[in-house]
């Protein structure tokens, strides 16, 4: 258990679950922005990535604990493999947890707020979950493209 030395209040623990497959220079920035003693980071790197091509300092953090999953899946857009990789991250984190919050990110997401702001927000709203949605015209077109059209054989797409 981690304790805040200033007021003996238990610090909230956050698990950041990251699916990465490309743009590793952005992943490096993401990891540095999440490098906080209150965070543990779980990283799934797509099986198609040659690990030897990644710089080893990508995996060095000063404060957060980083767990790079040994089991790597070949993840394809729109395929069940995305869900399997997400579940693998969640199962791995829950075995090392518990955590107050689990955050699922891609390796190209970046937070727009500081870790102090994020942690304060979740402390203030402990016990609440936030599920965003939007119903604008542009979002409706994107929804129609993803939901109402068939995407057969996603496993064989070359991106």
Region spans (language model):
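ER/Golgi luminal nucleotide-sugar-dependent glycosyltransferases, focusing on the catalytic module
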Residues: 1-159
């Amino acid at each position: 258990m981690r304790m805040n030395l200033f007021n003996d209040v238990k610090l909230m623990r956050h698990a950041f679950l990251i699916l990465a497959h490309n743009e590793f220079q952005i992943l490096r920035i993401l990891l540095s922005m999440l490098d906080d003693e209150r965070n543990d980071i779980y990283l799934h790197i797509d099986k198609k990535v040659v690990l030897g091509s990644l710089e080893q300092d990508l995996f060095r953090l000063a404060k957060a604990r980083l767990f790079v999953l040994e089991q790597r899946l070949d993840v394809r857009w729109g395929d069940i493999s995305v869900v399997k990789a997400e579940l693998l991250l969640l199962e791995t984190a829950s075995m090392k947890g518990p955590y107050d919050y689990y955050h699922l990110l891609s390796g190209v997401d970046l937070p727009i707020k500081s870790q102090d702001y994020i942690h304060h927000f979740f402390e203030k709203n402990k016990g609440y979950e936030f599920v965003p949605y939007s119903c604008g015209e542009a979002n409706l077109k994107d929804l129609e493209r993803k939901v109402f059209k068939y995407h057969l054989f996603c496993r064989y797409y070359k991106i």
